[in-house]
Every structure is written in C-alpha cells, then in structure tokens.
C-alpha cells in the first residue's frame, strides 16, 4: 500500500475539474469527490501535511480488514483523507435510511452500516459532528437509496447518527475455539 511522503501535493486540475493528489514518481490520484462538494481552498495547491498522513494511516488501518482489493483500500483511504480536509459541510439526507433502535456515536474512521428499505452497506465515518456524521461508502456494489437513486463506492452522504449501526464482522471470526 502507499506510504505518504513530503513530496505529495494536493492541486486542482481545471481541465478535469477534479481535486488531484500528486504522489510523485509520475503517479497522480484523482479524488472521487465532485468539485461542487469541495471547499474553495481545494482549488489551491498545498502539501500533503503530517496531519493528512496521520489521518491516512487511521483510515488505512480501519479499512485493512475489509474484503475489498488492496488498490480499492488505497483509493478509499485517499478519498477519505480528501473528504476530511476538503469536503463542504452538507445537510443530512437521513430519510433514505432506516432509524436504528440502538443509538450509535461513531468515531472518525469507524466502519459502520446504514440500511435502506432496499439494502444495507458499509460506510466509513469521515466526520461526526455530534448528532450527524459524514460517511463514505466502502462497499464496491452500489446501494439503492430509492427506486431512482443509488450511492456508489467512495460517495459521501451525511446522516443523523440514529440511522447508523456499528459494523461488526461475523462473531465467529472473533471467537476462539476451546477444547
């Protein structure tokens, strides 16, 4: 997986209308967040900071156990760093998701699940603002939000925390067999 260094640079590509991350060695990452969801400072060139590297490491560790390919994990972690630094504030769109009976207060970089009447998917928490969280989808398969709308890998959505469930891997994987 990628290892951040002090040569990485954020910049905005006007031709592609996209935030980019120059990774050095002729490698460039195109951030998956639409330009309309980025704060104005995303259009200015700036370095990938020590804070960015620390946040990247947290995301990388929390997605390491997910059943997606290593390149997808790197893509997810880089998009999550970009979202944590450059995503505009947004209003919750909780109506797509089912209210949960158990309250959840997720931490940044936690893996959580959200359920619609049409399915369920895993997300990573980008920012918990108290009663709502900005989340990024981690599942590769799209999740139908309604009959006409879906959310895809690395798309972001803000939801009230009462719609979020903590993600738990199969309990069987966490149990030790005895005797």
Curated annotation (Swiss-Prot):
Disulfide bonds: none annotated. Its main location: cytoplasm. GO terms for cellular component: cytoplasm. It is found in: Cytoplasm. Signal peptide: none annotated. InterPro entries: ZapC (IPR009809), ZapC_C (IPR048372), ZapC_N (IPR048373). Keywords: Cell cycle, Cell division, Cytoplasm, Septation. One of its GO terms (biological process) is FtsZ-dependent cytokinesis. It holds the Pfam family ZapC_C. The keyword Transmembrane helix does not apply. Contributes to the efficiency of the cell division process by stabilizing the polymeric form of the cell division protein FtsZ. Acts by promoting interactions between FtsZ protofilaments and suppressing the GTPase activity of FtsZ. Interacts directly with FtsZ. Belongs to the ZapC family. This is Cell division protein ZapC. It comes from Photobacterium profundum (strain SS9). The gene is zapC.
